[in-house]
Amino acid sequence: MARSPDPKGSGGLSQRQLRVGEQVRHALAQVLQRGEIRDDLIAHTVISVSEVRMSPDLKIATCFITPLGNADTQAVIKALAANAKFIRGRMAPSLSQMKYMPEFRFRADTSFDNFSKIDALLRSPEVARDLGHDDEEDREADKASRNGDE
């Protein structure tokens, strides 16, 4: 029996994948915050873990990270990948309820870049003019519907 499409648009992830992904994200953030990784680049960089997507069998965790500050994203990803087994071992106690510890894959989180592009587009004069025009039309339609109700 096939699953019905997810109406919330979560990318087809199951509730279990979402829950476990959030637990892994929290545990990874704790390991990074405590500074347990002995790598100069990671130790001197604040790293934001925005999302962790679990594979359907929960054996692969794709971690989306953003280094804050002037750190080179690709260099941070390489450093995290080089320390993935150490990170996995440090996270094991806090994820002891899992049957298997997942393999970690690190990716750059580009959602912040996408948000800033959309924000810049919305602030552009052309879009602001169009949005202002739509607002005037909406106000006129609201007035017309109110006058019709009376």
Swiss-Prot record:
Q: Which Pfam families does the entry mention?
A: RBFA
One term under GO cellular component: cytosol
Where the protein is mainly located, per its record?
A: cytoplasm
Kindly list the places in or outside the cell where this protein is found, as annotated in its UniProt entry: Cytoplasm
Q: Please give the start and end residues of each transmembrane region.
A: none
Keywords of the record: Cytoplasm, Ribosome biogenesis
Biological function: One of several proteins that assist in the late maturation steps of the functional core of the 30S ribosomal subunit. Associates with free 30S ribosomal subunits (but not with 30S subunits that are part of 70S ribosomes or polysomes). Required for efficient processing of 16S rRNA. May interact with the 5'-terminal helix region of 16S rRNA.
Query: What name appears for this protein in its UniProt entry?
Result: Ribosome-binding factor A
Q: Which organism is it from?
A: Brucella anthropi (strain ATCC 49188 / DSM 6882 / CCUG 24695 / JCM 21032 / LMG 3331 / NBRC 15819 / NCTC 12168 / Alc 37) (Ochrobactrum anthropi)
